[in-house]
């Protein structure tokens, strides 16, 4: 069954586990999966968990790209990136990138979240291909994947997703990471 929630979620036992199978099979395996996490979901038929994970990661990519774009603008306008993220976290724009990615991995200078650009590219491709198959317009997903591919071209498929921030630093001539 696919999982989502990052390394922090895995350590804390809070990852989302997406199970696609018959309902009676789900009821049998749920107690076993609850040992790993309290967040176990029956998503429908076989394969639905994979579709949901790919869709979730496409949404994560879109939010991450949008967040880096806006924080880059704010930094360019003279606002400290730490202040920008702190305020956004208490406002309607908060998301995984402002909660985890920026403070824990980019603003800290760590630059490691534990999820590669190649894995994100795989999931974004699955979700976008599914959109094509279902004749669903996904313009933000397509644009976000294009920006991800710019990062992959520069840093490779094994690069951490935190490197997407470097693409924005370079494009906007700003710095999100500490100077040290």
Predicted regions and their residues:
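Rossmann-fold dinucleotide-binding core
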Residues: 1-61
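Helical "substrate-binding/catalytic lid" subdomain
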Residues: 28, 48-171
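ATP-dependent carboxylate/acyl-activation modules
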Residues: 34, 175-180
């Amino acid at each position: 069954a696919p999982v989502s929630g990052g390394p922090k979620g895995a350590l804390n036992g809070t990852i989302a586990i997406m199970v696609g199978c018959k309902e009676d099979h789900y009821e049998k395996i749920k107690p076993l999966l609850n040992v790993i996490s309290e967040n176990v979901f029956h998503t429908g038929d076989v394969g639905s968990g994979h579709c949901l994970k790919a869709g979730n990661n496409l949404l994560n990519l879109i939010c991450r790209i949008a967040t880096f774009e806006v924080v880059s603008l704010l930094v360019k306008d003279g606002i400290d990136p730490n202040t920008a993220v702190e305020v956004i976290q208490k406002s309607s724009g908060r998301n995984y990138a402002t909660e985890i990615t920026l403070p824990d991995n980019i603003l800290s200078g760590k630059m490691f979240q534990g999820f590669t650009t190649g894995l994100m590219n795989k999931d974004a491709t699955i979700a976008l291909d599914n959109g094509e198959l279902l004749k669903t317009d996904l313009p933000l997903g397509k644009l976000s994947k294009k920006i991800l591919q710019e990062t992959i071209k520069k840093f490779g498929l094994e690069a951490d997703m935190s490197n997407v921030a470097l693409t924005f630093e370079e494009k906007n001539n700003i710095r999100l990471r500490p100077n040290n």
